[in-house]
């Protein structure tokens, strides 16, 4: 009697899953208005986490550290102290 020893191999490759391939959505942080630009009161000037830039004249700070203009005027990014920055809004005479 003739015995056949057959071995079958997979015709389709098994596909494993990966634990990579996802990332959080970007938060669009940073400057929203340029130095010297005219803004209206309530305009967002800078979005940040923590106080990378401090509020100066006529600028408020929101609960998430966003800096916004309190009055209509021109934006001015300034340095104060040795290594700190602030943003101010100065009224423009018309």
From Swiss-Prot:
UniProt keyword annotation of Nuclease present: no
GO aspect biological process, one term: translation
Recorded coiled-coil stretches: none
Keyword Ribonucleoprotein set for record: yes
Post-translational modification: The N-terminus is cleaved by ribosomal processing cysteine protease Prp.
Protein family: Belongs to the bacterial ribosomal protein bL27 family.
Protein name according to UniProt: Large ribosomal subunit protein bL27
The organism of origin for this protein: Bacillus velezensis (strain DSM 23117 / BGSC 10A6 / LMG 26770 / FZB42) (Bacillus amyloliquefaciens subsp. plantarum)
């Amino acid at each position: 009697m003739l015995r056949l020893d057959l071995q079958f191999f997979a015709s389709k490759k098994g596909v494993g899953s990966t634990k990579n391939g996802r990332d959080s959505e970007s938060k669009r942080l940073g400057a929203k208005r340029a130095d010297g630009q005219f803004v209206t009161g309530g305009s967002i000037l800078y979005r940040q986490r923590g106080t990378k830039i401090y509020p100066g004249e006529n600028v408020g700070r929101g609960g998430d550290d966003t800096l916004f203009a309190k009055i209509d005027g021109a934006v001015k990014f300034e340095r104060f102290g040795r290594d700190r920055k602030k943003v101010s809004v100065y009224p423009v005479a018309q």
